[in-house]
Amino acid sequence: MTILIKGGHVINPATQMDEVADVLIKDQKIKKIGKELPEKEAERVINADGCYVMPGFIDMHVHFRDPGFEQKEDIYTGMQAAAHGGYTTVLTMPNTKPVADNPDIINYVHNKAKSGNCIHVLQVGAVTKGQQGKELADIEGMVKAGSPAISEDGKSVMDAALYRDGMLEAARLGIPVLAHCEDIHMVRGGVMNADAKAKELGLPGITNSVEDVIVARDIILAKDTGAQLHLCHCSTKDSVLMVKVAKEEGVRVSAEVCPHHFTLSTDDMKEADTNYKMNPPLRTKEDVKALREGLRDGIMEVISTDHAPHTFEDKNRSMQEAPFGIVGLETAACLTHNELVLGGYLTPMQMAACMSYHPAQIIGIDKGDIQPGKAADVVIFDPEETYRIDKNTFASKGRNTPFDGKEVTGRVKCTICDGEVVFNELNK
């Protein structure tokens, strides 16, 4: 189908284009960008007046729970949630059942995603077999099957020597290592940040050092091996500081922040609500400020969701018993715009870079770029619309969000992937 997006404000970090223009899509590619392109060239015209036209968002960190936990989410519902959130590419984490530690699981996920005809799904491979931290997985085989990166997400590889071997293999194969930074020996049953709020609620806490010591270790190993390190869901002020210093020293490191970590602090927890239980936990206002400033200053380059759906039954338990995790695909863009763009931390161009261009550069895919000849992966975002988040409208199976009822300004209106409209609330 030939689609003409009319009158939108095109924001393209790859070229720094920042102006009102029309975008013509044909044969799954961007065909033309220009002023007043003739409508007769298109089979479908989408009026994007007053909206941003950005490269389709890329989420480097989601959990689609498939295979093994399809009661929480499956590839099809996960893709729909992603499309509703403006995402055209996502990286799914390997902590499934069975673990994505071999080419067969990589192929299963990719083939199932392709059959859904929605968005691009790239399965990340595990670092170790079964995520047991004892023996390296078949990393080369998974890369040949299309895995763009490796990760032990959900935990850290605590054996530093083994992890170093994994980093060396990743460096040899030219793929990044996505690091979940958590010293499991220091968690000690903690369920939220170790601060005054934890004491008030009578809950065991997780200190910042649980994250910080592994961030430090992994940066040192990246420097030692030359591997490309990407730090997942950073939550502490010292993580930001260490990334800054590492970059200044030439270490190949990048880092992501999740919307819940730059939006909420433990001060927002009025009670022991498991929708506020995620890993890493919400931190203090001081940490939130550091994360926002890190994104503003380009130290932290990526905004990812760590989309982690659970059933109502899973979350309808005590803080000690309920699993960690919240959904995020359908709230990330509006929260980023509401908290960071309107909050004065990011420009719309920086928002697009953090949510599309930078992830594409880190994982080495030719996306995150709206110009002729590039893939027609596009999101149309209305920066003016104000509404309340309603979890009951989510396409995801998960309803586990602390943002239900929150008023935000900025909404995804249309998502186009490979030249096909996969979500649309415009021109109805």
Give residue ranges: language-model regions.
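Divalent metal-coordination and catalytic microenvironments
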Residues: G8, V23, Q28, G50, ...
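His/Asp/Glu-enriched, well-ordered alpha-helical/loop segment
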Residues: E200-Q228, N275, R296-I303, A308-P383
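Alpha-helix-loop-beta-strand connector modules within alpha/beta enzyme cores
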Residues: P103-H120, L168-A179
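Histidine-rich, glycine-flanked metal-binding segment
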Residues: M1-P55
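Metal-associated gating/positioning segment near the N- to mid-region
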Residues: A48-A113
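C-terminal cap of metal-dependent C-N hydrolases
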Residues: S318-E321, A375-K428
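Histidine/acidic residue-rich metal-binding segments in metalloenzymes
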Residues: K134-I303
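Active-site mouth loops of central-metabolism enzymes
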Residues: M60-E73, T96, L122-E135, P204-N208
